[in-house]
Amino acid sequence: MNIVLLIYCLAMVVAHDLQLFGDFKFELSDNWRNDCAKKALEPIINQCAEGIETISPFQQKSIAIQLSICEFENAEISYPSECRSQNLDTCILLLEKSPQYWTTFSGYYREIRNICHQVSLPFAKDQILQVYGNITEFYRTLMDEMTNSSKYTENMQNELKAKFDKLIGVIDLILADREKNREDLKSSFNMFKNNFEKSLNNALVVMKHSYEDANSNVKELESHLNYFINDMSQVYILINEKALEVKSQQDRIKEHNADILNQIEEIKKNLDNAYEEASEVQISNNQLVHDIQSSLDYSLFTVSNLNSHLQLSINDFIEKNEDIRSRAPIIFEEIFGLFLNHLNESGQLAMDSFEAALDLSLNMLHQKLNQTERSIDNLNSKVSDLAHFADSLKKYASSIFNVPNYVRTSMNHKIQQWREFGNIMVVGGVFFFVVLTLLVLSFIRTQVMKVFRFAFIGIPMITGIALAIFILRLLSMPMKVVDID
């Protein structure tokens, strides 16, 4: 702004000086422009300014003739008409015939260089004055334009000031209106916040009760599994005791029947193989129990994943609550609907994951039961083969070696015990397979929540009944001790 004002003041001063300078009149310059000699010397004025040595002899003769003509015309003396046609050679010949003409021509011819030097200074002055006059006119025009621009700028400033005053008034009205709307919006938002917090608290209470119910169901399932594991451990201990008792009786028979050791060596090997098969079956049962435990652990892990999904849903809901607080209350119904959909999707996802995990566990259990059933069938077939082999061997030994009656009685008793043990294993496996099949069919045909209730209550009850029947049958087996003394 300061620079603009400085330029404006400088232009004013220069314009004033030029206006004063334009009042002067240069009469000498006007006379010079109208002089015949000036017109004659115009072709060489520029050369005179650069240097007189640049003037050629032809130019010197032409300028001398033109100056002579000017002098003749000023003195009103007639001269040859050929000199007007710019025929220099003819004109010079005609001027040579008259002493007066020749003296004038020769004088100008000799003084051309001096005249050129004298005339160049007024001509330069005239050029300077002309340029300065043009500059004066330019600055005068510029001054007028700047004056008009200053007036236009002042008018624009006044108009802008009036418009800004009106705009400031409108802005004040808008701000007052917005302040009033802000108070109304604040009260509406507080009301929305209170209602939303109440709804959120109710939803959290419902989710907490659901989580507690699921936790109680998991604990009940854990107690039933512990009961099932304890029963299986007792069965395993009884089987080991029976196996040890059988082995001790075999050792006593071996000690008191040294005479028939070679004949029953093959029977002993077969009994050892049968014992190994029973051990393998026991190991397979233990592996089955371990797989069941793993499946149950996986189910617990799935339940924990369900809990984590619910927790993530709660966290996501809290984040959305923070986002909702910054919005208008008109979107409350849409947000609540989206929240319910999200909870339903999360619950459905968790239920699908739990169903998939339970299906996988049941499939694995079904495979293990099939393997156990095949092992029991193999063991039953081997026990049957062993029984037939023992019967044939007994007959052969009785007919050849006349085996004592107490030995035959002991052998028959042991064979009968192994046969009954194999039958019990087969019946128990078939019963367990039937129960599992019914459970799978009920799981397919009923709703998921009903199956869960049946699984929490029915499976442990059926398993306990089956184990009780198995243990009663095992304990009811006749275990006679043969006195061989």
UniProtKB/Swiss-Prot annotation:
Segments on the Lumenal side according to the record's topology features: 16-423, 472-485
Topology in the lipid bilayer: Multi-pass membrane protein
N-terminal signal peptide: 1-15
GO biological process per UniProt: karyogamy involved in conjugation with cellular fusion; nuclear membrane fusion involved in karyogamy
Keywords in alphabetical order: Endoplasmic reticulum, Glycoprotein, Karyogamy, Membrane, Nucleus, Signal, Transmembrane, Transmembrane helix
Record-level GO cellular component terms: endoplasmic reticulum membrane; nuclear membrane
Glycosylation sites: N134, N148, N344, N370
Cytoplasmic-side segments: 445-450
Keyword Nucleotide-binding: no
Bilayer-spanning residue ranges: 424-444, 451-471
Top-level taxon: Eukaryota
Pfam families: Tht1
Location(s), subcellular: Endoplasmic reticulum membrane; Nucleus membrane
Coiled coil ranges: none
Family: Belongs to the KAR5 family.
Reported function: Required for nuclear membrane fusion during karyogamy.
UniProt xrefs under PANTHER family: NUCLEAR FUSION PROTEIN KAR5
Protein's name in the database: Nuclear fusion protein KAR5
Organism: Candida albicans (strain SC5314 / ATCC MYA-2876) (Yeast)
Origin organism lineage: Eukaryota, Fungi, Dikarya, Ascomycota, Saccharomycotina
Gene for this chain: KAR5
